[in-house]
């Protein structure tokens, strides 16, 4: 299993157990493994979605 697939797998497992912050970190780590920012963009979008889940669930407090 390559590094990108490894981080994506860990992100999926974290999401399944409701740990959206860890899922976002793993998607970010997967994105950073791509040779260009454009190639990593889909993983960054998934990381943003995971962070949005965390905010919605009150796991991350957003200042005003």
Report each predicted region and the residues it spans.
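Alpha-helical tetratricopeptide repeat
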Residues: 1-11
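Inward-facing hydrophobic residues that define packing positions of alpha-helical scaffold repeats
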Residues: 8, 27-28, 34, 44, ...
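Alpha-helical linker/edge segments of TPR/alpha-solenoid repeat scaffolds
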Residues: 39, 46-64
């Amino acid at each position: 299993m390559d590094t990108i697939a490894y981080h994506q797998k860990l992100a999926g497992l974290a999401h399944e157990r409701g740990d959206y912050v860890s899922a976002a970190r793993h998607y970010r780590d997967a994105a950073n493994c791509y040779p260009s920012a454009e190639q990593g963009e889909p993983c960054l979008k998934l990381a943003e979605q995971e962070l949005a889940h965390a905010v919605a669930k009150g796991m991350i407090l957003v200042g005003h």
